[in-house]
Design a protein with these regions (language model features):
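Glycine-rich dinucleotide-binding loop and its adjacent helix/turn
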Residues: 38-80, 84-92, 182
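Active-site acidic short loop of glycosyltransferases
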Residues: 29-30, 53, 70, 158
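A Rossmann-like FAD-binding core segment of flavoenzymes
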Residues: 1-21, 26-29, 91-183
Length: 183
């Protein structure tokens, strides 16, 4: 049986298991497959939700890359996912700015990806820099970022931002039923 509703609790102290659906029914089950996905880590930016899918993305696929042909884009993040996204988007975008809050990539990204970023003239690494504001009407049109070393802000006509800052698993409702680590 497939139920396209939100499970809110799993009672696993005896068999059959019981899955609570929203504030409503409880469904007994001999087996439960849990595919909860993750919640993207999102910076506390005004207008972020307004531009999701209209210039703000949490993944870089072929589809998004086609929207960025010949444009300047931003990839936010310092991990391997951000590095892979930057290298991938640099194939179609005119310029890819990689913004990281830290002083570099060495602690969070593989040496191989760092080398590919450094060798790609279409990729510009901006360390100790983060987005301060997103602006536009129905679609993202401008991004203001702040360099924390100098304190200077810069506004750029950029229509596509890729937040590659990780995610947190949607497993909070499984306490006591599955073993989880801190990640």
């Amino acid at each position: 049986v497939i139920i396209a509703q939100t499970a809110t609790r799993l009672a696993c102290d005896r068999r059959p298991y019981t899955v609570e659906i929203g504030n409503g029914p409880r469904v007994p089950a001999r087996s439960v497959i849990i595919a909860t996905g993750a919640e993207y880590r999102k910076p506390p930016l005004e207008n972020l939700a307004r531009f999701e899918g209209a210039g703000v993305y949490y993944g870089a696929t072929f589809m998004e890359a086609q929207l960025c042909v010949g444009e300047e884009v931003i990839v936010v993040g310092g991990g391997n996912s951000a590095g892979q996204a930057a290298v991938f988007l640099a194939q179609t975008a005119r310029r890819v700015y990689v913004l990281v809050r830290s002083g570099g990539l060495a602690e969070s990204m593989s040496r191989y990806l760092i080398r590919r970023i450094e060798e790609n003239p279409a990729i510009v690494l901006r360390t100790q820099t983060e987005i301060a504001a997103l602006e536009g009407d129905n679609h993202l049109q401008r991004v203001r970022w702040r360099d924390h070393r100098s304190g200077n802000s810069e506004v750029n006509d950029i229509r596509h931002v890729f937040f590659m800052t990780g995610g947190d698993p949607n497993t909070h409702w499984l306490d006591g039923c599955v073993v989880r680590d801190t990640k």
